[in-house]
Amino acid sequence: MYMYEEERNNINNNQEGLRLEMAFPQHGFMFQQLHEDNAHHLPSPTSLPSCPPHLFYGGGGNYMMNRSMSFTGVSDHHHLTQKSPTTTNNMNDQDQVGEEDNLSDDGSHMMLGEKKKRLNLEQVRALEKSFELGNKLEPERKMQLAKALGLQPRQIAIWFQNRRARWKTKQLERDYDSLKKQFDVLKSDNDSLLAHNKKLHAELVALKKHDRKESAKIKREFAEASWSNNGSTENNHNNNSSDANHVSMIKDLFPSSIRSATATTTSTHIDHQIVQDQDQGFCNMFNGIDETTSASYWAWPDQQQQHHNHHQFN
């Protein structure tokens, strides 16, 4: 029974060894094709160090894998060198973009693990003066500045780009401040106008109330005056009517008295006329009046009596 188990273990070990040999062939066989393709790049297989047998059992995998990766990198480099010119140019452009990415904000070139190379004060002043002349960088001016300042054209372009971005930011800040000041002034004016409008509205409401009160007062006074005028007119009319009634009643009751009053009034008028005629008669006495005139003069009482009688009949 023990012998049987030992033989089975030996068989298993042999099978395991075969599998490992198939998985990790010898280095001569493994790199034969690679040697044929890259004869001028790779050393001969005989120059490679031999792989110890113990590496095939328990730890040889990592070693072979590392060697395989190293030679694979060499092969990739060989294939990249044999690509078309267009691909090479594209890669050069990408390299330039990568180099531009390594540039700092002020245009200085940064290598991997290298500190920023800042521009000196004179270079910055010269670039500032050039930027004041024009914020857009032309190719000719870029080359002139690069030669004059001892910088690369790419550094000049990046510095102008960053400086233009800062200038736009400052310009926006100035515009914002100016607009904010204008807004504050307009807001203040608007607030004052609103307050003045509110004050005027309050005054208008007060004037309307006062006007309504005055109108009501005037209407009330006018109504009272109308009532008083109507009352006085009616009283005057009543008084006039009563006076007329009284006169008519007196005429009806005393007609002879009224006629005697009328005759008295007429005689008074005649007496006044006689006095005037007497004055004229006395004046004519001294002017040589004749008998006819004197006769007519002395006959006046008869005529006066007739005239008096005529008025009585009327």
Curated annotation (Swiss-Prot):
Chief location: nucleus
A cellular-component GO term for this protein: nucleus
Keywords, sorted A to Z: DNA-binding, Homeobox, Nucleus, Transcription, Transcription regulation
PROSITE patterns: HOMEOBOX_1, HOMEOBOX_2
Tissue expression: Expressed predominantly in flowers, and in the cortex of the root and the stem.
InterPro entries according to UniProt: HD, HDZip_class_I_plant, Homeobox_CS, Homeodomain-like_sf, HTH_motif, Leu_zip_homeo
Composition skew (Polar residues), residue ranges: 82-95
Protein known as: Homeobox-leucine zipper protein HAT7
